[in-house]
Amino acid sequence: YQNRNGKPFSWDDVFPGYSKLTPQARSAYFLRDDLTDTEISSLKDYGADMSLYLPSGNEARLKAAYAQRDPRLAATVILPYSTYVGGSTGAALTYTSRHPYRRDTAPELDLQTRYTTRMYYWMRKFVARGTECQASEYTGIDMPVFRYADVLLCLAEALNEQGRTPEAIGYVNKVRDRAGVAELDSNTWTAVEGQDDLRQRIIDEKHWEFAGESGTLYEDELRWGVWHQRRFLGSAPGEQSEAGLKQVWGENVAPYIYAGDYCYRWAVPQS
């Protein structure tokens, strides 16, 4: 996700030299305040560069890094040190996503997940809160199949492919206005440089808008021919990709493996 003003986000702008660090070393930026000596020792063994750690300001510094991002990021996932109202005890309690995890009881009320030794971006979108549902296997939240935002972006794509790019921009901006981000053509970062540029911006917009949804994004990726690059970062068939299940600081815990280009076209039954 970009910044709210349309500027591309880079961790290097927040923490200079971030991308040159190993994922383990830069995990220090994501740690909770007031670590114990035991926690610090364990994190050093993991590879965290504790010279980067602020004992009493680490959480606030990290939260500030997310403050100006596209609001759809925080609406889609639970960000580090943000809260989530859970109901696992039978009562609605406010938990905070922290690392390392300690306990989900007072006074900490850390968000307990399936993997308490790791820190992921857990889903927030369409996840029940508090005591809205009695089991994680089902929810009363209706999952949209086709949203109005998709109608607008499909229309924008069709108009752009017809060469009606200025008209198409208006429909993309309807989605961006609702999301609370800068309109296209409103500043240097959002300036549209023609049909090809808007085509890519529509692809990006659909990913930001529909992340984590069960709508048409997968079919769109196949249709655009970007599924291999978007999901597997262009890795060769059978090889581990740089994409995968990652901790928030980028450690790839479970790399994806691309099966091959045949996935783009399903076989036609011969009988």
Regions found by a protein language model. Name each.
Residues 1, 32, 117, 122-123, ...:
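Generic hydrophobic, helix-prone segments enriched in Leu/Val/Ile
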Residues 57-72, 76-79, 86, 108-117, ...:
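Charged/polar interaction segments and conserved charged motifs
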Residues 1-103, 229-236:
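An aromatic- and glycine-enriched ligand-binding surface/loop that stacks and positions planar moieties
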Residues 106-147:
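Active-site beta-strand/loop architecture of penicillin-binding DD-peptidases
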Residues 182-186:
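Boundary/linker segments of alpha-helical solenoid repeat arrays
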Residues 50-55, 131, 188-189:
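A short linear-motif detector with a strong N-terminal bias
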Residues 1-21, 107, 135-145, 169-172, ...:
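Long, intrinsically disordered, low-complexity segments
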Residues 65-69, 73-78, 122, 142-177, ...:
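Extended, hydrophobic/aromatic-rich amphipathic alpha-helical segments that build helical scaffolds
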